């Protein structure tokens, strides 16, 4: 990729962040600027479904399609996630649920369950706990049976999310090495 291509690619990404579809069309169709997967990723972050559709229809390179789904999930853009996965056939991976949980988007997690998503990683629960999203944490653990680890306890404690911490402790989440939970009291080392 030459410097000019790299500059054009960055320009397309920046235009996608403006949410101005007509400008993106102009730089692609009239100015023939190059683009890459980060353009559709930016459109997903912004929740711009029409721009995503334009990117798909015009074969925006999507070697990292799963990131577009993850960004839509992280930002709570259900319509975009639905279109990317169901119509454009973009894959999703463990980041899709993990980033939705991190941002507290229970509706995204519910959609994933409806669609038989099964790529939950331990940090889905850790991300929910770290950011105080008790509803997501409970849903992941009780409905999805997502795995968890000691990081969830550490993050809930470090970020002062007592409701998440208590839920983790009450439900026997593993503790960080050297930590103890005895008689209703957490002891950290």
Model feature map: region roles:
Residues 1-189:
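Ankyrin repeat (ANK) tandem alpha-helical domains that serve as protein-protein interaction scaffolds
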């Amino acid at each position: 990729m030459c410097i000019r291509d790299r500059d054009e690619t960055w320009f397309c990404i920046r235009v996608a962040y403006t949410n101005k579809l007509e400008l993106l069309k102009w730089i692609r169709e009239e100015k023939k600027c190059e683009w890459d997967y980060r353009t559709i990723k930016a459109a997903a972050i912004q929740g711009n479904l029409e721009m995503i559709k334009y990117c798909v229809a015009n074969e925006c390179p999507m070697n990292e399609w799963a990131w577009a789904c993850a960004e839509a999930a992280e930002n709570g853009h259900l319509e975009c996630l639905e279109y990317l996965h169901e119509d454009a056939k973009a894959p999703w991976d463990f980041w899709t649920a993990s980033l939705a949980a991190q941002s507290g988007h229970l509706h995204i997690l519910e959609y994933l369950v409806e669609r038989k998503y099964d790529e939950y990683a331990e940090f889905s629960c850790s991300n929910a706990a770290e950011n105080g999203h008790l509803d997501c944490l409970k849903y992941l653990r009780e409905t999805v049976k997502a795995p968890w680890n000691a990081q969830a306890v550490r993050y809930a404690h470090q970020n002062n999310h007592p409701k998440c911490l208590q839920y983790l402790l009450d439900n026997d989440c593993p503790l960080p090495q050297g930590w103890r939970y005895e008689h209703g009291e957490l002891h950290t080392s």
